[in-house]
UniProtKB/Swiss-Prot annotation:
GO molecular function per UniProt: adenine deaminase activity; zinc ion binding
BP-aspect Gene Ontology terms: adenine catabolic process; hypoxanthine salvage; nucleotide metabolic process
Ligand binding (substrate): 282
Protein name per Swiss-Prot or TrEMBL: Adenine deaminase
Site (described: Important for catalytic activity): 224
Function recorded in the entry: Catalyzes the hydrolytic deamination of adenine to hypoxanthine. Plays an important role in the purine salvage pathway and in nitrogen catabolism.
Length: 354
């Protein structure tokens, strides 16, 4: 199927919020090599092309192996600043108006990089981006689920001197064998501190992980969550409680969660009333930032202009923003979709190849 040209133009230009992006996953090969040279870090690949060629993942773990190797070049505040500004420029070009950025401090503190170096480098770039690009943002500290809960608790405590620089906590890394309940205490502690709560669940893990993230960790959003489609009662609950799913289609395709995007459940979830939102996850590794994810989804699935409006709205409704700012963004989205002529439904303007 091929997306209607007018609709393609509109989804590129619509205001969007990005709620599922790992800042370490925005490190392009060129930036990795520049930082390696600056910091005298030896890489296992001779050049940019060889590194890019290594991005042939078969599952989440094979991706994580190279992801952590790439992060090894991040050593100074300047490194984190430069990486973050690279992302902001790409996101702003895709009409991302607000981003809630995941960062993985354990990836860096385990290498001897101070917590403050990580947080200050990212936060300073985001502060500059607000002025230079009118780019709204916040930060979400993620725990690595393949590590222990004790390590997560220590990480949270170490980050508390920088509490004013992040708005929530999340849970990422390898889902298999690391159920949500493993982190019940650290999420309870974060809730006591008034932090927002999100967690990756139902990507490679079963639908039960989505339920457990909601009931045990008390999360407000589910990152990925696509396997919820396997449980009708869970889908109904997500719709009823307006729990947003931060879906990342190109990531799902690259990691073989859904190798063929025509089989992706996002449209079925959206039609069932679930607050689906679209994001890039680790765009440097998965070959696509926000607009690429939107375009691939609309190319593969019978999504139309009404769906696009809904997806854009959902992204801001699910954001951890003050009510006034959220209302302003929603008004901006509604004005965009009402002020420009609506394109016909994508289902009426597609060509299908078999």
């Amino acid at each position: 199927m091929t997306i209607d040209a007018a609709l393609a133009d509109k989804i590129r230009r619509t205001p969007k919020a990005e709620l599922h992006v790992h800042i370490e996953g925005t490190l392009e090969p060129e930036r990795i090599f520049r930082l390696a040279q600056r910091n005298n870090v030896k890489l296992a690949y001779p050049d940019v092309e060889a590194l890019r060629a290594a991005y042939a993942f078969t599952d989440l773990q094979s991706f994580l192996d190279i992801y952590y190797a790439g992060a090894s070049v991040l050593l100074t505040e300047e490194d984190f600043f430069d990486m973050t500004m690279d992302y902001v420029k790409r996101a702003a070009a895709d009409n991302v108006r607000h981003a809630e950025i995941f960062f993985d401090p354990q990836t860096h503190t385990a290498r001897g990089v101070p917590m403050g170096t990580v947080i200050d480098g990212i936060a300073d770039a985001l502060a500059q981006a607000r002025t230079e690009y009118d780019f709204s943002s916040s930060m979400i500290l993620c725990f690595l689920r393949h590590l222990s809960e004790e390590d997560a608790l220590a990480t949270l405590e170490a980050a508390l001197p920088y509490r004013d620089r992040f708005v929530g906590v999340g849970l990422d890394s390898s889902e298999r064998g690391n159920p949500p309940e493993k982190f019940a205490r650290v999420f309870a502690r974060a809730k006591e501190l008034g932090l927002h709560l999100v967690a990756h669940a139902g990507e490679e893990g079963p639908p039960q992980y989505v339920t457990d993230a909601l009931d045990i960790l008390k999360v407000e959003r589910i990152d990925h969550g696509v396997r919820a489609i396997e449980d009708e009662a869970l889908v109904q609950r997500l719709a009823r409680e307006r729990v947003a799913l931060t879906v990342c289609p190109l990531s799902n395709q690259k990691l073989m969660v859904h190798p063929d995007l025509r089989d992706h459940p996002m449209k079925r979830l959206l039609d069932a009333g679930v607050a689906v939102t679209l994001h890039s996850d680790d765009p440097a590794y998965f070959g696509g930032y926000m607009n690429a994810n939107w375009e691939a989804s609309f190319d593969a699935l019978p999504l139309d202009a009404a769906d696009a409006h809904k997806l854009a709205r959902n992204s801001f409704e699910a954001a951890f923003l003050p009510d006034v700012q959220k209302a302003e963004f929603l008004a901006e989205v509604d004005h965009f979709w009402s002020a420009t002529p609506a394109s016909p439904p994508a289902t009426a303007n597609v060509t299908t190849t078999t």
